[in-house]
Regions:
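Conserved acyl-donor/pantetheine-binding loop and adjacent beta-alpha core of acyl/acetyltransferases
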Residues: 24-53, 59, 115
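Conserved acetyl-CoA-binding loop-helix of GNAT-fold acetyltransferases
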Residues: 51-54, 60-73, 96-100
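Conserved active-site alpha-helix within GNAT-family acetyltransferase domains
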Residues: 65, 77, 89-107
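Conserved GNAT acetyl-CoA-binding A-motif
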Residues: 68, 75-87
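Short hydrophobic/aromatic beta-strand or adjacent loop that forms the aromatic wall/cage
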Residues: 22, 119-125
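Active-site rim helix/loop that mediates acceptor-substrate recognition in acyltransferases
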Residues: 1-10
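Conserved beta-hairpin
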Residues: 9-25
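Conserved catalytic-core motifs of GNAT/GCN5-like acyltransferases
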Residues: 86, 99-120
Length: 128
């Protein structure tokens, strides 16, 4: 999160001054998405959303869906044709939220850098 804040790509969902959720929005190609065991839907330019988190007390209240919708609007405004995201294979609640938001499962990726380099993730994409 420190790098996300430093790079000014962190967005917060809040209500009455209470933080309900947070996500990172990336407009540069994600090196972890260069190779996929599967196939991305689009070869066009994409934005990426990362580290989508909803506060425990806000879960089940549509916060994730609203954050995804905001990310989609930002991506469209910036001229992107799709949004990509990834999650852990065991993160079933996030996979359900992604499906509900219109993301399609595209295949498996491995993180290309950072402390979890090489870790398996499931890649999703939504065409805007």
């Amino acid at each position: 999160w420190k790098n996300d804040i430093k790079n000014q790509c962190t967005y917060v969902a809040e209500e009455d001054g209470i933080i309900l959720g947070i996500f990172a929005f990336q407009t540069t190609p994600d090196i972890s998405y260069y190779e996929i065991e599967g196939e991305w839907i689009s070869a066009g330019p994409y934005a990426a959303m990362h580290r989508v988190c909803v506060a425990e007390e806000a879960k089940g209240k549509g916060v994730a869906g609203k954050m995804f919708a905001h990310g989609f609007r930002m991506a469209e405004t910036l001229g992107f044709s799709s949004v990509r995201i990834d999650t852990h294979p065991g993160n079933i609640p996030m996979q359900r939220a992604l499906g509900k938001a219109g993301f399609e499962r595209c295949g498996e990726i491995h993180l290309a850098g950072g402390p979890e380099k090489g870790s398996l993730r499931i890649g999703f994409e939504k065409i805007l």
